[in-house]
Amino acid sequence: MKKLLLSVCAFSLTLATLQAGEITKYVNPFIGTGAIDGGLSGNNYPGATSPFGMIQLSPDTSEAPNWGDASGYDYNRNTIFGFSHTRLSGTGASDLIDITLMPTSSGRTSSAFTHDEEKARPGYYQVMLKDEGINAELTTTQRNGIHRYQYPAGKDAEIILDMDHSADKGSWGRRIINSQIRILND
């Protein structure tokens, strides 16, 4: 009897996992990411995050987001200024949007992109950075952001780390007062 009960439980868990995977294919992470007719956007972002995770890894389409694109991403824009690790979704107030990485091979701090070469699904984001031909892929675990950059052959691989990147420094007077980096292995 115990074996039968355990078998039924294991089978049920397997079905639940399969159903969850099938359902996520209907999710469109771009819903609520763009302003309509000059109004405010839904303040959502298409990037990677895990349920109850500490990291919300997504592109920044503004150097200093404000009310109109408080999540750091606006679908109507076509420039990426980096990939931030924390952000709020749907709040209408820009906050977090810090610890930004930007892949480059020439020191550029931004790159054009098109939505034709941008993909998102729950837990995953990918975009081709047009200016230098760098493919960026992002995913997360509960406590980590994972980046994978593919650079064109023969180009230098550089990453700009901006620990002073924060939402709308101008109008709200925010500034980072202390930041540090510790390299454990190189």
Residue spans for each PLM region:
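Bacterial N-terminal signal peptides
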Residues: S7-T14
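Positively charged n-region of N-terminal signal peptides that target proteins for export
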Residues: M1-L4
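Accessory carbohydrate-recognition regions in carbohydrate-active enzymes
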Residues: A20-D186
